[in-house]
A protein has these predicted regions:
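Short beta-strand/loop segment that forms part of the nucleotide-sugar
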Residues: 30-39, 61-65
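Conserved nucleotide-sugar donor-binding catalytic segment
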Residues: 129-217
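Conserved donor NDP-sugar-binding/catalytic core segment of glycosyltransferases
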Residues: 98-136
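Short aromatic/hydrophobic "clamp" motif used to bind/position activated sugar donors
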Residues: 86
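A conserved acidic beta->alpha catalytic loop
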Residues: 22, 37-47
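Short, well-formed alpha-helical segments that are part of the catalytic scaffolds
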Residues: 12-25
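C-terminal subregions of glycosyltransferases and related glycan-biosynthesis enzymes
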Residues: 186, 201-293
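Glycine-rich, basic loop-to-helix element that forms the pyrophosphate-binding segment
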Residues: 65-81
Length: 293
């Protein structure tokens, strides 16, 4: 099987029928749909079960787990996946009807690329709003890792990364006791140290940002998961390929969220040279507290 289309969900039963109908329209059929229910209290299980009685037949595999956050659901789904490629499809988003076919064709072309440097770990395409407007400013058609995408080619906004399943098994999200959020960029940056992506200039993912979602409350979410936030920014200060100004911003954000630590929060160190970022980090933290109080 080529694809695992993976949907993490938490109390989004009302959105799943639309997502199912969109998947039924895919022109490429060599995929399974893996749904990991992150401890929902609504009727998600019954909704998913109703799909199995309908005509559109592709494998639907449903798993329920204790609530731990999206990143833990991804780890769970990766372990259950049967597909060679792993595509994360959030419950409020959708794929254009030819999306999987485009990705499959691009993936076939990977075999003809010369083997030099890092291995290719997946495919990366454009995200767009439902009106067709591309999100951010992607400007590359070729091969690059996630760090090069942002800091050499100047790509902004979300992209749709479709990784080899074995790559995500090699680089799981850290699961920190008491925290329910981990930035995807932490793992994408780790993957970039070993693997590149085949980028192609096609819209393969349509995204909505729902009110009350993770994106809408990202500062508060990061404050509630300070260890994962610190880990992300601390590692960014040490990554080759990230320019000094970006590493300085990362150091400022490290201190910004370190000040949210609880006694039980694991310690995440940062180099002594970044003590200079403490004061601006403190000011940002105080502003966060004032704004969110």
């Amino acid at each position: 099987m080529l694809f695992t289309v993976f949907t993490p969900t938490f109390n989004r039963a009302a959105l799943l029928p639309r997502l199912y109908e969109r998947l039924c329209r895919q022109t490429f059929r060599d995929f399974e749909w893996v749904i990991v229910d992150d401890g929902s209290t609504d009727n998600t299980a019954a909704v998913v079960d109703s799909f199995r009685d309908k005509e559109c037949k592709f494998p639907i595999r449903y798993f329920n787990k204790e609530n731990g956050g999206k990143h833990t659901a991804i780890n769970y789904g990766v372990q259950k996946a049967s597909g060679e490629l792993f595509l994360i499809l959030d419950s409020d988003d959708e794929l254009p009807m030819d999306s999987l076919n485009k990705i499959a064709e691009a993936w076939q072309s990977v075999a003809s690329l010369p083997a030099k440097g890092k291995q290719i770990g997946g495919i990366c395409g454009y995200m767009a709003h439902r009106d067709g407007t591309v999100i951010g400013h992607p400007t590359i058609n070729g091969v690059a890792d996630s760090i090069e995408l942002r800091y050499i080619y100047g790509v902004t906004g979300d992209m749709c990364e479709v990784f080899r399943t074995m790559v995500l098994r090699e680089f799981p999200f850290p699961e920190i006791q008491g925290e329910k959020f981990c930035p995807e960029v932490l793992v994408w940056n780790r993957i970039a140290t070993k693997y590149t992506l085949k980028i192609f200039p096609e819209i393969i993912y349509l995204r909505d940002y729902l009110q009350g979602g993770l994106t809408d409350n990202i500062t508060l979410v990061r404050m509630r998961s300070p260890a994962a936030s610190m880990m992300t920014y601390s590692e960014m200060t040490r990554l080759a390929g990230i320019p000094f100004r970006a590493r300085l911003r990362a150091a400022i954000n490290y201190w910004r969220f370190r000040l949210c630590r609880r006694p039980s929060t694991p310690r995440v160190p940062i180099g002594h040279r970044w003590m200079c970022a403490f004061l601006p980090g403190l000011l940002l933290h105080l502003n966060d507290v004032r704004t969110l109080s």
